[in-house]
Design a protein with these regions (language model features):
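Active-site hotspot residues in diverse enzymes, especially metal/ion-binding acidic/histidine motifs
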Residues: 1-356
Length: 356
């Protein structure tokens, strides 16, 4: 017989980033570490007082411990943004467990509402060894997805339209993004925006960086650090295509002005620093000028609060759309809809406004 409660307790504890000892401490002697271990092993069951305490400390509803997902998954080929994602092993496990929980709900919902969902994943067959190879891959993506030379209004929306499962999580400050595979489906995990009006250019670049890890094949001779740089080249080239960058930036320049960079950022949704890197790669500036730009950028503390704003929400909405479709067709109840969106039924009812 499956140990449902024990497995869900382990999952909730990992999502909270707690060890058994941490959980015992948070429960303030309501139950011992040894008893918690027995709960997880399925050798003991908690009483109602302990169950409520676990629910409060782990921030999950009591029902969570007894819900059995219809779709059970295993995240495979997990890959983080190395050299930029600086999180501990415990935080990493927490992120992965949250991603797994979200994926289970997402895929279960999709199976109920839209089981014949088609995907248009980008696949690039050539081996990537150089920055020019990454540039060519970006050109190919724009061609295959019929993007032309126009700015991309919403990167996250574009990826969702192509069938990628984009998930946002509450995650530690050191986390940028990760990718994973689930039964042939491609998952992209991003950090949830916490501030109203937060600058989205970094999230756009991160989403495309994870797309690069999904889509590109790198030479085995290349070290991981170089692969990360090539992913960055690809994502920047998708955002700001070479022909347009060369036309707008012009060659042999010695200066960049903040006003000009703001115009580029607000049109293309790309950060100042990524524009500098594009200019260097495309031969518009020399490495000496590039170094000067970066020094000036940091001296003015622009990396802390970069001016200019790209007007896009960059939030995944596919799961919400599936929920509302399920409600409108009476496939889902209010309680089920709330479960799939990971919120309480009363909170969901509060924000639900039926027109007809």
């Amino acid at each position: 017989m499956e140990n449902v409660f024990g497995n869900k307790l382990v999952s909730a504890r990992k999502m909270a980033g707690m060890s058994l000892q941490d959980l015992e401490n948070k429960l303030e002697k309501v139950v011992s570490r040894q008893a918690l271990h027995k709960y997880e092993q399925g050798k003991m069951k908690p009483d109602s007082q302990v169950l409520l305490a676990l629910s409060n400390v782990l921030h999950v509803p009591v029902d969570y411990f007894y819900s059995v997902p219809a779709v059970k998954i295993e995240l495979k080929n997990i890959d983080y943004r190395k050299y930029s994602s600086k999180i501990s092993k415990t935080e990493q496990l927490s992120v992965e467990e949250k991603a797994k929980e979200n994926c289970e709900r997402y895929l279960e919902l999709e199976h109920l509402i839209n089981p014949n969902e088609k995907s248009e994943y980008f696949v690039y067959d050539k081996i990537i060894e150089t920055a020019d190879d990454a540039e060519n891959a970006a050109k190919k993506l724009r061609e295959v997805w019929s993007l032309g030379y126009d700015p991309i209004p919403g990167v996250v929306e574009m990826l969702e339209d192509k069938g990628y499962k984009v998930i946002e999580l509450d995650a530690p400050d050191g986390f940028d993004g990760m990718k994973a595979d689930v039964d042939g489906k491609r998952i992209i995990v991003l950090k949830k925006s916490v501030k109203q009006g937060e600058d989205v250019v970094r999230k756009r670049l991160t989403a495309l960086h994870e797309l690069a890890h999904h889509s590109l094949q790198f030479s085995k001779k290349i070290p991981e650090k170089e692969i990360e740089k090539l992913c960055h080249t690809f994502s920047s080239a998708v955002l700001y295509p070479a022909d347009m960058a060369k036309k707008e930036l012009s060659k042999d320049r010695f200066h960049f002005y903040q006003n000009e960079l703001m115009l580029i950022k607000e049109r293309w949704g790309i950060s100042f620093s990524a524009v500098f890197a594009r200019a260097l790669h495309l031969g518009i500036i020399t490495s000496f000028i590039y170094k000067r730009f970066n020094i000036g950028y940091r001296e003015r503390k622009l990396h802390l609060n970069e001016p200019g704003k790209f007007m896009s929400k960059e939030k995944p909405v596919k799961m919400q759309r599936l929920v509302y479709m399920g409600l409108s067709k009476e496939i889902l109840t209010i309680n089920e809809a709330a479960y799939y969106l990971g919120m309480s039924a009363w909170k969901f009812k509060e924000q639900l406004h039926q027109i007809v």
